[in-house]
């Protein structure tokens, strides 16, 4: 006589959990793709394949999410600026890194989304203005450190920044095959000594 074999219970799959940053990043992705009207708890949860209940582990409500999204974007921008200083020893390396960074589309998309949101939200407008000012000031410092006088440094910083923002907010971005060559030529143009 054989005894029936007991079937081992299949382990339950672990519940999917995502951290607060995943919610904020997805909110910015949705803001970019569909506008503020679609930045809703249900929409984000569906995109993340989570329940709405998981949202409340991280946020009180949608307003808390929107405030947190702006602050998260701002902090990421400030962290990027700080990271440049630690990853490059010379100002020319930092300038080159900023030019190269322009090509990173996800961050560009988040920047576009935040700029659009800033048109209707005071907190976002303050964050964008602060980040713009810090970016231009930082670039000015790099051009000063590269040997340019204050006016030249300021003009070059603004030219680079306007190029960077303009490239991803207009339909005039270069073809992928042209990007590397254009980035190199822009770098050489910006770090070339003035010809006065």
Explain the meaning of each model-derived region.
Residues 22, 26, 30-64, 68:
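Helix-turn-helix
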Residues 26-34, 80-84, 114, 163-167:
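Solvent-exposed, amphipathic alpha-helical segments
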Residues 62, 69, 73, 77, ...:
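Hydrophobic/aromatic residues within well-ordered alpha-helical segments
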Residues 68, 79-112, 160:
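Hydrophobic alpha-helical connector segments
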Residues 78, 107-112, 122-147, 151-158:
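Amphipathic alpha-helical packing segments from all-alpha helical-bundle domains
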